[in-house]
Amino acid sequence: MYAIVYFNGKQYKVEKDQVIYTEKVKDVDPGNEVVLDKVIYLSKEEEKKAGKPYVEGAKVITEVVEHGKDRKVKIIKFEGRKNYRREKGHRQEYTALKIKEIEG
């Protein structure tokens, strides 16, 4: 059984006990539940449901595992022959969600 959900501006294909990494979700602590109710597609053994735009009555229950920062991405600006170099770094924050249950 799997589902395709729309969350935080992106689509994720999820299965039970899977951990997904999404952009940081504010105001939720690790251990809390987050309900994803925008289910686009739901597939059971032989039953498949596609939403228009979302599957009615379907939801995915997740648990917040952790908040963290991704690895550093370096941004370099460089102009040759002008002695101009700038280096900057960025670490994107993320939230790890564990899929507990898929209903629908």
Swiss-Prot record:
- GO MF terms, alphabetically ordered: rRNA binding; structural constituent of ribosome
Q: Name one GO cellular component term.
A: cytoplasm
UniProtKB keywords:
Ribonucleoprotein, Ribosomal protein, RNA-binding, rRNA-binding
Is DNA-binding among the key words of this record? no
Q: Which residues form the signal peptide?
A: none
Q: Name one GO biological process term.
A: translation
Q: Supply the Pfam families for this chain.
A: Ribosomal_L21p (PF00829)
What SUPFAM superfamilies would the database entry show? L21p-like
Relate the protein's function as given in its record.
Answer: This protein binds to 23S rRNA in the presence of protein L20.
Subunit-level organization: Part of the 50S ribosomal subunit. Contacts protein L20.
Family, similarity comment: Belongs to the bacterial ribosomal protein bL21 family.
NCBIfam families recorded for this chain?
L21 (TIGR00061)
What this protein is called in its record is Large ribosomal subunit protein bL21
Species assigned in the record: Petrotoga mobilis (strain DSM 10674 / SJ95)
The primary gene name is rplU
